[in-house]
Amino acid sequence: MKQVQLKSRAKINLSLDVLGRRSDGYHEVEMIMQQIDLYDLITLEERKDSEIRISTQCEFIPTNEDNIAYRAAEIIRENSGINRGVNIYIDKRIPVAAGLAGGSSNAAAVLEGLNHMWRLRLTPKQLMDLGVKLGADVPFCILGGAAIARGIGEILTPIEGLKNVWMVIAKPAISVSTAEVYRQLDLSKLDSRPNTDEVIQAVKEGDLYTLAGKMHNVLESVTQRNHPIIREMKRKMLEYNAIGAMMSGSGPTVFGIYKNYGRAKSAYENLSILYKQTHLVQSYSRRKWDE
């Protein structure tokens, strides 16, 4: 029986700006996305019937069509005109609903894995075109590495990402609705916005100190107001020697960037006492088809 196993990597945002609201209700964004080496393990196994079955050790994610990985299997079947079944096992390690694109990354892995397992020969561009129908972050998760994302997040320009930079990420025990964060965002009241070009230059040069001073997420203004723990977590990251700290996506996960492994590990040991879902990670900057 055919089987494929893939790593489904998380992402963080090194900057996130919202440019305005579109006529279709979505928001126009400009952000820098960076993969990290925290990943879920996705195992795909061909079935003899035509059913799609999802299983996981994580009680917080659905195992039916409400799971974006299920819908990814459906959409690639429909696109290819085939009716094969598949078992999808998700070994969930990325925190759920955390602003880390865990679900989108799972969907990307299913698209890539079934493309390989069923020998569909779809190009990365074709996979990304399918992915955007599932969610704005899915195309980036197919691309991998680091990129500038524009539009609703689906217009991607690859960039040189951070190379093996040590980070600590921590998710507090709260949930955040992305739709509600965007609804509450008042662009006219923003105190500051990121300079994307300056962030890109700092990333390209590997200048972590300049990056720390330039990276900015406009959605923090909403999530921090609703959940003061975000501000406290950033303060704790800096207290434990982070060069810079920021919220990823709409939250609630906060990440800190560290000068070296020793400082990151020390921070991880301290922060994991305070926050259960804390991870010691590195940036990951290889695009999928470079591997």
Curated annotation (Swiss-Prot):
Pfam families: GHMP_kinases_C, GHMP_kinases_N. Disulfide bonds: none annotated. SUPFAM superfamilies: GHMP Kinase, C-terminal domain, Ribosomal protein S5 domain 2-like. Pathway: Isoprenoid biosynthesis; isopentenyl diphosphate biosynthesis via DXP pathway; isopentenyl diphosphate from 1-deoxy-D-xylulose 5-phosphate: step 3/6. ATP binds at residues 95-105. It comes from the Bacteria. Keywords: ATP-binding, Isoprene biosynthesis, Kinase, Nucleotide-binding, Transferase. The active site is at residues 11, 137. Its EC number is 2.7.1.148. GO terms for biological process: isopentenyl diphosphate biosynthetic process, methylerythritol 4-phosphate pathway; terpenoid biosynthetic process. It catalyses: 4-CDP-2-C-methyl-D-erythritol + ATP = 4-CDP-2-C-methyl-D-erythritol 2-phosphate + ADP + H(+). GO terms for molecular function: 4-(cytidine 5'-diphospho)-2-C-methyl-D-erythritol kinase activity; ATP binding. Belongs to the GHMP kinase family. IspE subfamily. Catalyzes the phosphorylation of the position 2 hydroxy group of 4-diphosphocytidyl-2C-methyl-D-erythritol. HAMAP family: IspE (MF_00061). This is 4-diphosphocytidyl-2-C-methyl-D-erythritol kinase. It comes from Alkaliphilus metalliredigens (strain QYMF).
